């Protein structure tokens, strides 16, 4: 995806934030996503279960949020750099499914990181029981391929 509008317009609409995210189009919880990953056999079962058990053990709450990682906006500053490194560590240690580790790291950074939730979805082409209108902020690269 490619940004389709001036980032200043997004800041005007949502205010200053470190991350601008879309909610996940189908689920609202990390643990729901883990169940979906396990059911579809999208990653190593033992690894994903180990990740889930660790998150539960350290108190990761259910329904903290789940986000579409296909397109998001990140301000470049020290807190987002630290956030990105912590997220990368989780992806290296556990599942490479980025949506599994993102909410956990976000939870750990919630007192240092300001997040704005964008309206719509990352892609209007995803069939979902929730919102399905796409968004005005990004274009889909597939539309540009000839």
Regions of interest found by a model, annotated:
Residues 43-145:
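Catalytic core and acceptor-binding pocket of nucleotide-sugar-dependent glycosyltransferases
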Residues 21, 27-45, 123-128:
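Cell wall/extracellular polymer interaction/catalysis modules
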Residues 1-34:
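GT-A fold catalytic core of metal-dependent nucleotide-sugar glycosyltransferases
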């Amino acid at each position: 995806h490619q940004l389709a509008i001036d980032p200043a317009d997004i800041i005007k609409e949502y205010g200053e934030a470190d991350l601008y995210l879309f909610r996940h189009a189908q689920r609202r919880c990390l643990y729901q996503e883990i169940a979906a990953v396990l059911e579809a056999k999208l990653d190593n079962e033992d690894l994903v279960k180990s990740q889930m058990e660790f998150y539960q053990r350290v108190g990761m709450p259910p329904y903290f949020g789940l986000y579409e990682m296909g397109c998001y906006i990140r301000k470049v500053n020290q807190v987002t750099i630290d956030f990105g490194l912590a997220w990368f560590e989780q992806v290296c240690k556990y599942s490479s499914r980025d949506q599994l580790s993102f909410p956990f790291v976000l939870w750990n950074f919630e007192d240092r990181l300001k997040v704005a939730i964008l309206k719509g979805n990352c892609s209007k082409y995803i069939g979902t029981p929730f919102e399905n209108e796409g968004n005005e902020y990004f274009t889909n690269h597939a539309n540009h391929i000839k």
